[in-house]
Amino acid sequence: MDNVDSDQTKPIPAYYCCYLLRSTVNKRAGLYVGSTPNPPRRLPQHNGLSKGGAKKTATKNRPWEMVLLVEGFMSRTAALQFEWAWQHEDSRHMSKGEPGNTKRRQRPRRSLTANLEKLHSLLQSPCFSRWPLNIRIFASDVYQLWRVWCDRANGTIPEHIRTIPDGNCPHNSPEPETDHPRVGSIDGIQTDYSKIQDYLEKAVFLLDDPNELHCKVCEAQAKPEKELVIVCPQASCFGISHLLCLSARFLKSSNDPNQLVPRSGTCPACSKLVQWPLMMQELSFRTRGGKEVQVILRKKARSDKRKAAAARPAEIDANTASNEPLESTAQAFDRLNENVHQDVLDEDWAEELDCASEDDTNERLKTGSKDQQRVEIVIEDSDEDDLEFL
């Protein structure tokens, strides 16, 4: 219960995934299912290059490779639920028959094909089929096997769940959407909030003057200090809406009476398609991120100043041209954090997300002040992953 309650007070993670490991020494020797907010950090731990790897991967099967990721989990709890269901073939999440008619296998199948079969079943199940997930595959043989299985399996996974061929998968594979480009390798995965910093800066700046804000759905005044207000993620759009107003509009337009949470919809201001999970991530970070919001946006302000100075002639004072909007944004930062709880994050908190099996990352983040203590926001890797042998 503590983990669930903690998830409800944190921003939606910048990144969280479940992953499938495979031994590079003997690709038929073992498979490992786990979850993490930081694959580039987690893989070296499994391979013994840094502390904190799971004991079950500390074997002669090293080195391991991450061949498949299931991305898009909105909380650590959600990722752990999916991970557990993927590990356990008799999970209720995968049951196809009526209670009492499904026989439990005496020995679970643990091959690569069996893992892909279980994954395919999970993504069709009522428990997970509506989640905003994507599959990223880094090994060409795994990608080919996944495509074969999707073609022959009963049922199909929902259209919004995309398969992204990456790594050494053939480049003539169908290209993914621009929102989910190829990254080349595990090290290319972006696990921090930098991808939404432009969006975040725009939102904070727009909400700086609440007297001029009106919901694009109900046209009533929006009060960011009292209500949850959403800003359109399109760079050229300045539309804002009440959370409940826009949610109801999106659900109505989906024509799906069983859908409880929107996945996407058309912005009432710019008429462009926008993704609900992205807007919720920005909203949760803006309202729960505390001083980390200031840290990220001040970094961006410095970066913008450097770019502006490099683009202007030497005789033009870059600071004069760029300070005015930044001052207004800085004022918004201060107001945003007046009522934020004093338990805040240091600037590098995203680099120190704890793993439950990472014994070396359990120290409390330190601040420069001896009188002020800060409580670390922790997003852990799982420590109950299942090593599978043939």
From Swiss-Prot:
CDD domains: GIY-YIG_SLX1. The keyword ATP-binding does not apply. A zinc finger (SLX1-type) spans 215-270. Residues 14-99 form the GIY-YIG domain. It is an enzyme of class 3 (hydrolase). Keywords: DNA damage, DNA recombination, DNA repair, Endonuclease, Hydrolase, Metal-binding, Nuclease, Nucleus, Zinc, Zinc-finger. Its main location: nucleus. Residues 35-58, 307-326, 357-378 are annotated as: Disordered. Its cofactor is a divalent metal cation. Forms a heterodimer with slx4. One of its GO terms (molecular function) is 5'-flap endonuclease activity. Residues 362-374 have a biased composition (Basic and acidic residues). SUPFAM superfamilies: GIY-YIG endonuclease. GO terms for cellular component: Slx1-Slx4 complex. GO terms for biological process: double-strand break repair via homologous recombination. This is Structure-specific endonuclease subunit slx1. Its EC number is 3.1.-.-. It holds the Pfam family SLX1_C. It is found in: Nucleus. Catalytic subunit of the slx1-slx4 structure-specific endonuclease that resolves DNA secondary structures generated during DNA repair and recombination. Has endonuclease activity towards branched DNA substrates, introducing single-strand cuts in duplex DNA close to junctions with ss-DNA.
